[in-house]
């Protein structure tokens, strides 16, 4: 097989032998140069050998292109000098060039000047339009849209010249129209904190007017007046860990699993229920805590307190439960039975340190116990157990 150089030599040799014409089809014949005229006709004759001129049919005049026209005249005046057929003449004719010569071909383009961060240049455009992307790539891809190069054969990262990573100081924040100031809600200013959110969530600080200076206020005071964008460490997380209301509700309509399980374990200390038949059906069944019983659960000496009537109240943690009944009984709903006044017993049994024992912090509920059994049993219209 011949290589490209041998094929080129053979092509030029055939072009020189054929008189400066390319071979297209069939055998090339040596013909004389034919002058061209504005308009002429050629006589196409095909007589058989030995036949006279008069015996032949009348000649047919056919119009041919300008480049292949002969001299004008009658058949007697101008003898035929071109003996090729019409098919051979059309095969040698070249089609006109319809392409625009001013437009560069796909394989012809101007090589751009090589960039500092690239080791090989690439064309400005390939098939489509040039992508107007931001400068970036490699270690400088802070604000670039595409990390890949425009050409699939080159890469933007040149680690031989980029020896240092950019610092966070090179990063520029986007303009205000580039990102929304809020998402589904209004923009919450970090420098404004509601008064109800500044109270400490501690029992001793309730009602004393103590306020907390959150970290967001300190960070907001250090910022410049023109900048309003808070940093990631300037958000106030204290309001989410406290009650949003200044005081707890008097009663709750929800069913807490912890409260339901606490009520369902009524008198489950290992001793029999002293009054199982006196509790009304659908009433409120409460459980006496461990501090209200003498001895240990399961022992023979374990018995209910019989020294005096005991009043138990379930109030939220942090309230003073040692006052008279008229002071802490204001949270009862309308129609709830009231205990007799003058009972100075602690509202809830306390541990040795004096801290009220309260398991869940639920609404105010009363329970009275005397020597003969429950003096009165609160009966709500709608039982929380049903």
Curated annotation (Swiss-Prot):
Protein name: Protein STPG3
Positions of region (Disordered): 105-136
Organism of origin: Homo sapiens (Human)
Domain of life: Eukaryota
Annotated Polar residues bias: 107-118
Any one annotated GO CC term: cytoskeleton
Sections of the chain in a coiled coil: none
